[in-house]
Amino acid sequence: MSTTNALLYCAVNGIANNTNGIGRQTKTFLATLARHNHRLRAHAGAFTPYLAVPEPTPATWGYNEEDLLYARRVVEALGGKVIILPYDTRRPFWQPDAWRELSVEAARVAGHLAGRHAKVLAIGVDTPFAGLAHHAGAHPAVEVLLALFSTARITERPRPDPDRIAWEEEAIAAANLRPRAWVADIGDFLTRHLQDHYGLDPASLRSWPSGLHLTSSDLTPPTKTEAERIVRALGIPAGRPVVAAVGRTDHTKGLDVLIEELAPMRDDVHLAMVAVPTDDERAALLDHYRHRSAELGLSATIVGRYDRDIPRALAAWPDTIAMAVPSRGETLANIVFETALWAQHAGAVVLAPNIDGFPEQITDGRNGLLYDPAPGALTAGLRRALALTSDERLRLRTAAHRRVVAERNAAEHLATLLATFWQPRTTPVARLHGHPATDARTPRSQAPTSTHHPLEATP
């Protein structure tokens, strides 16, 4: 048996594809492993990284062989491997039956690794791998961390799927009960939400704030020439204020709201929207966005594909007055953090609703703009963004960049997380305001009894 530990990262996106926020989190994780492995080992001890991914097929949403090859290169260079998890690919993927099967397979892999390594930390990323909590304790060398980034009660308002809610509730209940199961504290809003609506015991938390690989080349601002080339190729008119937006074709992303609320400003701004089609019936929303924009007479460019260079260029383009994030529900929006890095020299100020995790990311008037989620409020927020002076815009962008760099270093966060599991007396590398050092956490045996709130759907 090896004396090193094993880190098993289980994710459905970002290994063989990259089509949503979970994909971005996984890419951040891989970049952190590749660039900061020595730092991680110095702080947490020697370990071998493994990736577990559902069996990829050509039908996988956004399947990209290059993504899979990159993931393999990263972990194999560190002695690990990508592990393919079999499941019934004939059944719908976004259903608890498929997730249950994947969680069983991931738990089996963790147990196998425990026979080869001193300790195993299995991280189940988001809802599909929440079922890992049920298997915690099956092997004394395996600990499980559920890294949830949202819930059905947030993303499926106002009518969340009851089967998905039940799956989430069962996972949190298991994490509360099992001594080697934990839940990642990725941010204040989501943690409060899990406590209030799912009965999460605070003693089950381990701090792992959402972060970015800050030195990644795709997070550096483009040159003005590069941004202009991309913007012009999209047909965006010169000299007109631009409102940018990026999201998938999903009701929760609120792109339809942005289109409607831009109508009173049709003569003032140009809409540059990236609407990434999903792999199901929601993809039809792309045509709806285009038709509705035409009906309202908007000046608009709606791009129906994802190329990371496009939002990067839009965020940094000097004519972009706002990166609008009109979500109906959001834990922590990657685009808020990314825009702060892309637009550090010129370009967009982020405009988002004053709901959920956005106030955790944005202090209104200091590093971005917030608006109340009421009819007409987004229009007012856009007018406010349009009226900003160049000095005001510079002040907001500078503060946004400074805050992200100070608070969202993924390498520091991962080093601290691993140390709390494998070097429990180690002083944390860094922590955010509101995220106490996890080695100072009340031991679960001494923690007060959790207060369970009514399991009601969020209005």
Annotate each predicted stretch with a short phrase:
Residues 328:
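Aromatic "clamp/platform" in nucleotide-sugar-dependent glycosyltransferases that forms part
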Residues 373, 390-427:
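A charged, aromatic-enriched C-terminal amphipathic alpha-helix characteristic of glycosyltransferases
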Residues 62-72, 228, 272-299:
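Short, structured helix-loop element that forms part of the nucleotide-activated donor/catalytic region
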Residues 151-152, 161-183:
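Membrane-proximal helix-turn-helix segments that form the acceptor-binding/catalytic region
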Residues 344-352:
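Short hydrophobic beta-strand element within catalytic cores of glycosyltransferases
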Residues 8-10, 184, 232, 236-253, ...:
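Conserved donor-binding/catalytic core segment of Leloir-type glycosyltransferases
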Residues 364-365, 369-376, 384-390:
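Conserved acidic donor-binding segment of nucleotide-sugar-dependent glycosyltransferases
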Residues 286-318:
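Nucleotide-activated donor-binding/catalytic signature segment of Leloir-type glycosyltransferases, i.e.
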